[in-house]
Amino acid sequence: MELPILPTSVIGSYPKPRWLLRMYKLRELGKIPEEDFKEAVRDASISVLREHERAGIDIPWDGEMGRSEMTEYFTSKIKGFKFYGPVRVWGNAYFNKAAAVDKLEYEEPLVLDEFLWVKENTTREIVKIPITGPYTIAEWSFNEYYPDKESFVMDLAEIINKELKVLEKHGAKFVQLDEPAMLNHPSEVPLAVDAINRAVKGIKMKVGLHVCYSNYNLLADYFDEIKVTQFALEFANRNFRDMDFLKKLSNKELGFGVVDVHNPRVESVEEIRQAIKKVFTYLEPEWVYINPDCGLKLLDRKIAYQKLVNMVQAVRGVRKELEKEGKTTIEFRTLKDI
């Protein structure tokens, strides 16, 4: 399978329509039937998909319209977790932090329904399914059952592995493990790496790993060891500085973050075009995908959309330059190719 060179994608989240946020609130208060809420989520999913497609994104997703939060969504579906109530993340932001109170078990698919709905309603051949990784789920949950963190994390890795196999069986081509917490404790990075590798054991499709702004020099020490196809990382947030760690990346792709998801200023097409060209100092264009730094959900929806539009326009400009060198397409690599 071939894709245009410098394929464009998203990381995961996208601003929810205001009417969907109202439905979330009504659901929380028990004032609407669950079927009404699910219908609203499906409608929002299609709306965001169309927005991504209209922006020109090659590999879209639905912006996680059915997910209230990136760990809560998964822990609510895994047997053995219990919720005690919300905890503060920052400012006035809260999430329901789960506690493992029994052995964790895979009872039902976690994101299969999401994937099948998106697959059915997109015009694109490939979508990217974001899944919160085992280490981050453990790090952002309480442990009231397991004797140590390793057994907690590795049981979650087994569960994610089962989910990936279900998705692959139903035609998924590209999943992305989100591990924003994996570099929090340098001494535990080997555990996070082992968990990722266990989660992808026996998987053949394309697997990306997204790690938010952090110490990428530490991550780079494990580039070869981590069994994924692609690393999706933030660069706009650091003004494209300190990129020398990319010299350690070989035979794996880079998802190059080119728009800042924390800044409402919309980067110009020319700014993004120049940023893209910087990465060619380290990697051949055939090994680069283009995406935002991270999920876009904290931005105003119009701003998020315009950032995607400008990102795609910048990519198209660089593609025209690469076309003069005979570079127009790339192979869609999977774990089998790495």
Swiss-Prot record:
It comes from the Archaea. One of its GO terms (biological process) is methionine biosynthetic process. Binds 1 zinc ion per subunit. Pathway: Amino-acid biosynthesis; L-methionine biosynthesis via de novo pathway. Its EC number is 2.1.1.-. Its cofactor is Zn(2+). Zn(2+) binds at residues 210, 212, 234, 294. Keywords: Amino-acid biosynthesis, Metal-binding, Methionine biosynthesis, Methyltransferase, Transferase, Zinc. One of its GO terms (molecular function) is 5-methyltetrahydropteroyltriglutamate-homocysteine S-methyltransferase activity. InterPro entries: Met_Synth_C/arc, MetE_arc, UROD/MetE-like_sf. Catalyzes the transfer of a methyl group to L-homocysteine resulting in methionine formation. The physiological methyl donor is unknown. Belongs to the archaeal MetE family. This is Methionine synthase. It comes from Pyrococcus furiosus (strain ATCC 43587 / DSM 3638 / JCM 8422 / Vc1).
